[in-house]
A protein has these predicted regions:
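Short acidic/polar hinge/loop motifs at secondary-structure boundaries
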Residues: 120-145
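Periplasmic-side early beta-strands and strand-to-turn transitions of outer-membrane beta-barrels
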Residues: 150, 170-171, 190-276
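Gram-negative outer-membrane beta-barrel transporters
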Residues: 377-384, 472, 494-575, 595-598, ...
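Extracytoplasmic beta-strand/coil segments of soluble accessory domains associated
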Residues: 76-120
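Outer-membrane beta-barrel signature, preferentially recognizing the C-terminal barrel domain
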Residues: 30, 180, 269-290, 322, ...
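N-terminal periplasmic accessory domains that precede
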Residues: 75-78, 100-105, 116, 128, ...
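Structural signature of Gram-negative outer-membrane beta-barrels, strongest in the C-terminal barrel
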Residues: 239, 339, 347, 361-475, ...
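C-terminal beta-signal and adjacent terminal beta-strands/loops
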Residues: 211-212, 476, 570-572, 587-633
Length: 633
């Protein structure tokens, strides 16, 4: 149980006290009207800059200022608060345990979201774990919903998330920060100059004695031990057109085990007890030609995960310990043909896998693709975009030749309103290690593929934004996990069958004035799978149906305070019970003590709910708080 060194009532009193202090003082924050543009520039959806109102896709944009004022713990936390996005985590804010990876889920399709950092794919083994991205490096997060296989290739089944890091520029400054709380503490430093940004931080987490909630009568009661994570990031402007990014994280001594469940080792029962060490590196060079219309990148993504089983007959590494890496190269050229635009490009990606226990288990996969996107402006009101991607995938089991088309239209009803249609196909290969250490036979897994159809309206007027989208997803060969083998207790990858989801999403944002702003969002869908090999094939719910978010912020002078809320309801039936609804309320308050000193109080899970972070029973943290002090030099 978490130690509550400071009671909720004391924290609320402290918050109210600071609320009184700020009256009549001078503001240091930037103008909220500049920080919260309702029609932001987007670079991911079309592979070129477009305003949100001119983008024929459903989008969510999270800015650096949004992250700061909402008090999001990390990138995962920021993304899962958006409408249409759920998540699978193994604890708080996307906690990983080895390759039990926290991941972002768009519109109910698990393991079908492509996550990138500055255009470099972060997915490994089809998981999009976000834990290694330093939150202090993030400038903007762009979320593009809908199948995006045409522009971005494999794994963009439900959509794409592009995390855009900060670029050097402006005056030189150094920020030092420290955080204390009843669960987390951290400290870090960031240097930002005209040509270079460097950040480094260290995070500590306390032990959580109860981390799972299972149906009544279960003997399983998991705990999570103390842990620490070290993060570092570099962003450099080598020239006006060439940028460099480097991100590093290692997490050591992250342990978990069971309080009362044990396995028999010889004649002795030992409680489950595991440790996970995790190291990640992501780096890349980007080129953005100012005058020639050429963009290019080369990138490298690496993860090494080592698990250690203390309860084995001979304690040692777990069989899933592995090295994963990928190399990416991409170059595109934009051709301006009068009012029309043609984008052509080539992409290369190589994925590598090597098991750390059984060294013979290694594999690699190489993908080569060419793509194009042609935008035809028929009139000032109507335009259409046709995209096509051809991809050759050299796979260790079965190679594939893929063709992914996409068709989009945009109709400008007037200067403040647009209507769009977006139809796209996506494709995803089984993980490169699917046949190692598992029961599935080579060739039995089929690639996932399918279509998304959506239409929507966007309206931006009088400091208000309204978005409405209706969508249908129709995919084949969804990959999931089998039931436990009665003899070995193991699960293995299988094609679960077809997937479908028809839904609607609505969002409203209002910047009332320079002090107040709020947003409301609601989504309803029906994500289902059907296993055609079952004795009685039928559609079965596969994720939550109801998704809602809300936020309200108040800024005046030196203080900004706000509430953010996320709800996921009518969740799926799994493991003999209905997964409970998830309800999370966060209160974040930031106060500028001086021009260079800031203090922030964040209270998470304010209602102290037992929130399932996945269908398996892993829990978010109970009510917890943290106080962060930042000094700028």
């Amino acid at each position: 149980m978490l130690k509550k060194n400071l009671s909720k009532s004391a924290l609320v009193v402290a918050l109210l006290t600071t609320t009184v202090i700020w009256r009549g003082t001078t503001a240091y924050a930037e103008d909220p009207n500049q920080a919260f543009t309702l029609d932001p520039m987007i670079v991911t959806a079309q592979r070129t800059e477009t305003r949100d109102l001119d983008t024929p896709a459903t989008t969510n944009i999270i800015t650096e200022q949004n992250i700061k004022e909402a008090g999001y713990k990390n990138v995962f936390d920021a993304i899962e608060h958006q409408v249409g996005l759920t998540s699978t985590g193994y604890g708080d804010a996307g906690q990983d345990f080895g390759f039990s990876s926290g991941r972002t889920v768009i519109r109910g399709y698990d393991r079908g979201t492509l996550v990138m950092v500055d255009g470099i794919p972060m997915n490994l083994k089809n998981y999009n774990s976000l834990d290694g991205i330093p939150i202090d490096m993030v400038q903007q997060i762009e979320i593009i919903k809908g199948a995006a296989g045409t522009l971005y290739g494999s794994e963009a089944m439900g959509g794409v998330v592009n995390v855009i890091t900060k670029r050097p520029g402006g005056k030189t400054q150094v920020k030092v920060k420290g955080t204390v709380g009843n669960y987390y503490k951290d400290y870090g430093v960031t240097y930002a100059g005209e040509k270079l940004i460097v950040t480094a931080s260290k995070e500590y987490s306390n032990k959580l004695t109860h981390s799972n909630a299972y149906p009544e009568g279960s003997s399983t009661d998991w705990w999570v031990g103390k842990g620490q994570k070290n993060r570092a990031g570099i962003s450099a402007a080598l020239t006006d057109e060439i940028g460099f990014t480097f991100i590093y994280q290692d997490g050591s001594n992250i342990t978990r085990g069971s309080n009362n469940d044990a396995k028999k080792v010889g004649s002795v029962y030992k409680k489950y007890n595991y440790r996970y060490d995790d190291k990640r590196i992501a780096t890349g060079l980007t080129y953005n030609g100012k005058y020639n219309g050429i963009k290019a990148l080369v990138g490298y993504n690496y993860r090494r995960t080592e698990g250690y089983d203390f309860a084995a007959a001979t304690p040692g590494p777990v069989s899933s310990s592995a090295d994963l890496s990928s190399y990416i190269g991409d170059v595109q050229k934009t051709w301006n043909l009068g009012k029309n635009t043609l984008i052509t490009g080539y992409s290369l990606r190589r994925e590598n896998y090597e098991n750390l226990v059984t060294k013979a288990n290694k594999a690699h996969r190489t993908s080569n693709a060419i793509y194009l996107s042609y935008n035809n402006v028929f009139s000032d009101k109507f335009s259409a975009t046709l995209g096509l991607r051809g991809e050759i995938i050299d796979d260790p089991v079965k190679s594939e030749n893929i063709l992914n088309p996409q068709f989009q239209t945009l109709y400008k009803i007037n200067d403040t309103t647009s209507w769009y249609i977006n139809i796209g196909k996506a494709f995803q290969m089984p993980t490169v290690d699917s046949y190692y250490g598992k029961k599935a036979a080579a060739g039995t897994l089929k690639p996932e593929e399918g279509w998304t159809y959506e239409t929507g309206i966007k309206k931006i007027y009088d400091n208000k934004s309204i978005k409405l989208a209706v969508f249908h997803m129709d995919f084949e060969n969804k990959i999931g996990w089998s039931d436990k083998d009665p003899g070995t207790g193991e699960q293995y990858a299988i094609n679960k069958g077809d997937f479908r989801n028809t839904g609607i999403e609505a969002e409203f944002t209002h910047n009332v004035n320079d002090k107040w702003r709020y947003s409301l969002g609601i989504g309803y869908g029906n994500p289902e799978v059907k296993d055609p090999s079952a004795a009685n094939p039928k559609w079965v719910q596969d994720d939550g149906r109801i998704d809602a978010s809300a936020s309200v912020f108040y800024s005046i002078s030196k203080l900004t305070s706000g509430l953010t809320y996320k709800y996921l309801g009518d969740r799926e039936y799994y493991g003999g019970h209905d997964v409970p609804s998830r309800s999370r309320l966060t209160w974040n308050t930031s106060y500028d003590l001086t021009k260079n000193d800031n203090i922030t109080l964040t209270m998470n899970n304010l209602l102290d709910k037992d929130n399932y972070s996945n269908r398996y029973g892993n829990l978010d943290l109970p009510y917890n708080w943290k106080i962060t002090y930042t000094r700028t030099f």
